[in-house]
Amino acid sequence: MKYLILILIFFIEINNGSRLINSGNLFSELKDYYIPENLNYYSGGYSEQHCKDSSYITIPLGVTGGLDEGSLSSFLLTKKGSSLFIGLDAGTVWQGVRRLTMLQDFNSVFNITYPPWATLPEQRATWFIKNHIQGYLIGHSHLDHVGGLIVESAEDQLSPKKNELEVSQPEIYRGCIEMIHKMGYVSDFPNITSIPDQKKPIIGINETLYSMATDLFNGFVWPSLPNYGRYSYYYLGNGNQYSFKDLTPYANKYVTKVQNDFPFNHLVKSFEICHDSLTSTAFILTDSQSGEQIVFFSDTGISTTKCDWEFKILQVWRNIKIDKLKAVYIESSFTNEVADNVLFGHLRPKDIMKLMDSLLENSIQTSPPKTNLKHVKLIIEHIKPQVGMNQYYLTSQRMVYQQLQEINNHGVKVIIPNQGVPICL
């Protein structure tokens, strides 16, 4: 019996080892890689059923608010059929992408291909960041919303070195490589010594980008990589609308060749919102062809200052065409039990559902008017981990979900995202 147990242990270890050696090839579902803390909430999905009527896909790279440095606020957004993504905040980037690219079905669904040398999880994650994230919308400059971008910035650029570009031709025509080829660099692209204007855009309001440039990318906290060709800053005015075609370093004669592709076929409008003593941002993204809209809120909520947070959000709702709205990303840092005076610019479930009332009442309505939000997905960001005493013995995610559903009077589809699980919108 003793020897039988030893033999069984040996085979178990061999099997576990083979899973590690094969890296991502065996991970067809997220539960094969890690077990979420709690499955008693709806976390969306990207199966054929989930995506049947969807236009967009979002990928949570980081879902918590503080403490968990491996999963801080960050999402990717793309249109179905595209392999280019826009970052929405960037608290955690590399860890979320690493988890994502280890899912075999993800790579096939998005037709993601890698250079022959990219066999390790870290190589694939870094390649994805370089070749598939086109740029970043940053809502405010707190570290839990920009730290991932700062830390991975040294590797966030396609290199003209032979081991990355020439080896990957002609097999890879997706992501940024596909974009650059469409712009007209087909003949000389593999052999050029530098990629013309290959800087990724960092887009935000003045206060956010000024802080990133002077407090983070300043040569002291982190090397000033935007000054060395990694990024370009694009400053948005409050309430102004811009085309993504104008938020790129490429000349217009090149951008017109991709103007019907995501994200260049989208408009973005920014709104200054309250985050206690800091100015945060809400972004409305609008498809210029279909009119469909996505709203992304960086941190916001009840303030200890005189900032009128509800009025600021009201201005966002007044720019929403309710029948075109696909999703709202918004934070719920705390549960309903937390008092107003310790929220410091954050929200609770009861605050969010009041905002849903306001959205339905103040958005641009149809005729006859819509009376519910059943067509809208509500993606909850920035849930802080449950670290204190809790009489319910539940995770923060489950408590927030339950409290939202208890007062969900408009039928909005509440989603508590899990890191690395794509969600169709």
UniProtKB/Swiss-Prot annotation:
Residues 1-17 form the signal peptide. The keyword Hydrolase applies. Keywords: cAMP, cAMP-binding, cGMP, cGMP-binding, Hydrolase, Nucleotide-binding, Secreted, Signal. One of its GO terms (cellular component) is cell surface. It catalyses: 3',5'-cyclic AMP + H2O = AMP + H(+); 3',5'-cyclic GMP + H2O = GMP + H(+). It comes from the Eukaryota. SUPFAM superfamilies: Metallo-hydrolase/oxidoreductase. It is found in: Secreted, Extracellular space; Cell surface. Its EC number is 3.1.4.35, 3.1.4.53. Belongs to the cyclic nucleotide phosphodiesterase class-II family. Phosphodiesterase with dual cAMP/cGMP specificity. However, displays a preference for cAMP over cGMP. Seems to regulate cAMP/cGMP concentration especially during cell aggregation. This is cAMP/cGMP-dependent 3',5'-cAMP/cGMP phosphodiesterase 7. It comes from Dictyostelium discoideum (Social amoeba).
